[in-house]
């Protein structure tokens, strides 16, 4: 049984930002698509697994490292594979590379299975995922960053009401929508000066349609999205100045 999923992608408008390059939000979409296709080949993507085993995948943590700019009309190869499989979590690595094999982006994700009815944690062996799938060598060994954020009202930048188009097939906030909210804490002039080199996000709680989110951050590097006193996500962005800035 093949222990990875691989495909080629042409970077068109769907995957490019206002600077005609793959930003963190677009990278999140590409990673999410690849993850879905990876699980689909084992008959356990979210739709199939919710129907047959009443379970869905929940992303706990994601870390993305940008090695090189990915630009409009670049053709790239995306590869996703497991690096560790435990009783309660699957650890994936994702590699974006040029067609001649140069790394462009490396990422790691930690996922768990939760019950689609009561949202309790499920053991991986209660899903169709093949537990005997041999892991591969990681391409990103740096650990996910530990974040202890306790931000108050003085750090609030804006609020956002979750609406229909923010949600996915599980009727909860789509993971990539959080990426967009974080980037929207700063105007385009800021992102014309700085780009994200490294991005960590921890998904702590879910958000559903109609709930308000408070986007907060103490500076340019850390962000927290809260609903009242409940933390939904914590994120850290390592920035680097653009050469043209």
Describe each PLM feature range.
Residues 13-15, 66-68, 164, 200-205:
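Short, well-ordered turn and helix-capping elements at secondary-structure junctions
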Residues 78-80, 157, 199, 215:
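Generic structural motif
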Residues 1-59, 106-108, 114-197:
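Hot-dog-fold acyl-thioester-processing enzymes
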């Amino acid at each position: 049984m093949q222990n990875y999923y691989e495909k080629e992608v042409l970077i068109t408008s769907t995957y490019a930002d206002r600077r005609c390059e793959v930003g963190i939000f677009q990278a999140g979409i590409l990673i999410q698509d690849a993850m879905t296709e990876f699980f689909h080949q084992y008959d356990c993507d979210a739709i199939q697994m919710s129907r047959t085993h009443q379970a869905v995948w929940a992303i706990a943590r994601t870390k993305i490292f940008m090695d090189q700019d990915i630009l409009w009309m670049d053709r790239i190869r995306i590869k996703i594979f497991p690096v560790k499989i435990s009783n309660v979590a699957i650890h994936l690595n994702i590699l974006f590379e040029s067609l001649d094999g140069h790394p462009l982006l490396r990422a790691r994700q930690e996922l768990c299975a939760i019950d689609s009815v009561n949202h309790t944690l499920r053991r991986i062996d209660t899903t169709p995922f093949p537990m005997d799938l041999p892991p591969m060598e990681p391409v990103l060994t740096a650990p996910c960053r530990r974040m202890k954020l306790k931000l108050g009202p003085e750090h609030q930048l804006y609020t956002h009401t979750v609406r229909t188009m923010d949600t996915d097939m599980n009727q909860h906030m789509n993971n990539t929508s959080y990426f967009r909210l974080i980037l929207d804490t700063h105007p385009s002039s800021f992102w014309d000066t700085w780009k994200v080199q490294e991005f960590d996000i921890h998904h702590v709680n879910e958000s559903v349609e109609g709930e308000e989110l408070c986007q907060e951050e103490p500076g340019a590097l850390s962000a927290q999205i809260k609903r009242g006193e409940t933390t939904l996500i914590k994120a850290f962005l390592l920035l680097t100045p653009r050469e043209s800035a």
